[in-house]
Amino acid sequence: MESKTYYATTTKRFILRTKHQDWLVETQIFYNEILAFYYNLYLKMSDFHEEGGQRVMRELEKLTIVGRDKQEVLYPLPWCKVPLYFRRAAINAAIAAGKSYLSRDEQQQRTQTFTKSVTFYKGMYRNLNEKSVELKVWSGEMWTWLHCRISGNVFSKGEEQLSPSVVLKEKQAELHVPVKSVVSDGRKAKLRIQDQEKIAAVQFINRDRLAVIAILDAKGNQCAVHFLKGGTVYERQCQKILTAIEKSEKATGYEESHHSNKKYWMKLKHLNEYYSHKFSKDIVEYCNEQQAGILVLPLYSKTYTKYVMNAVGNWSVLHLSGQIREKLKYKAWKSGIIVLETEAAGISSKCAVCGQKIQKNGTEYICKEGHRGSRYLNSAVNLGRKCLKSFEKQAV
């Protein structure tokens, strides 16, 4: 029996240049008009709401597109000669938007207008490489092929390119290309535990030492430890920008400075992106060095997470840890490491050596038996062992 092949999908961003930027704008406007049409139709048809995406698409097309039998349809599409795959991309986006609206606890007013980026399905783009791409676009009068130059990234060997999207930003256009690559190891966690693989348990410290990674063997013994540094550098750079924003607001007033400070807010966003990518990459690389096949993260309640995140603000090291977690999930998977989340309850209150209750003193701890050390490392070890025990219970 052949083993199953597993894949990871990530998105690569390119800067896109063309002589006809206005055609890209026209194409996006047209795309969103079609999207809005199908969004409202989908919400109107309550019978479709529990169906899968492909089934819903077929039903929506039956209601809007005249078939080979030339029979009239109930809701004819109010535009002529819309390319098949352009229409289907808009329908898929409309279904996703409709399902999102219906899933909200409190359904507010429906979206009236959309500004979604255009996804170009097969047949709507061609000759995609690292330097250029041809896109089928709407000029405002006709459909035409538009040659575009792209730069700023590369495709790796073995990657399969999927349907790209054109993202229009204030100062530039970007081409976002999803790429699919084979994952070296896609085994489930249970099999990895059975194969006695090491696990890496992460506890976020949210100081200069941003996180601690404890490597445990299959029996829960600590094999190695690594402290990830850099939190102070990140906070210092963020604070420098926030100070500049504060000075600008005092000098010109909030309303006037809000627009002029946009470049500063973008710098903060880019800092967050850069460091969350960097630190998540560092964690994955350390796991690979230690041959750990499972990465364990602490899981907190949504209420607790929301409360804490609101209290610390968007540019703290603690808030950065949330971005690191999200990036770890796909970076680790791409590297053949599986990510698990284990309930954090109880991991910080007992000694990992003897199980006695601990007393905290800053970043350190001490227990009744005299064991002492980093309370964050102690929590990481407890987290890893708690994860291992959960698999023992499953095996019983």
Please provide the spans of the model-predicted regions.
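Gly/serine-rich nucleotide phosphate-binding loop at the start of the catalytic core
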Residues: M1-N92
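Generic hydrophobic, helix-prone segments enriched in Leu/Val/Ile
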Residues: A8, I34-Y38, L60-E61, M124-R126, ...
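Broad gene-expression machinery/nucleic-acid interaction feature
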Residues: T11, E130-E134, W145, Q172-E174, ...
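Stable alpha-helical structural segments in soluble proteins, enriched in small hydrophobic residues
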Residues: F30, I34, A89-Y101, L377-C387
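Intrinsically disordered or highly flexible coil/loop and linker segments, enriched in small
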Residues: N40, K44, S103-R104, E289-G293, ...
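Short alpha-helical "patches" and their helix-cap loops
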Residues: F48-R55, Q107-K116, L299, V396
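Acidic carboxylate diad motif detector
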Residues: M57-Q172, K180-V182, H226
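Positively charged, helix-rich recognition surfaces that bind polyanionic ligands
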Residues: H176-V396
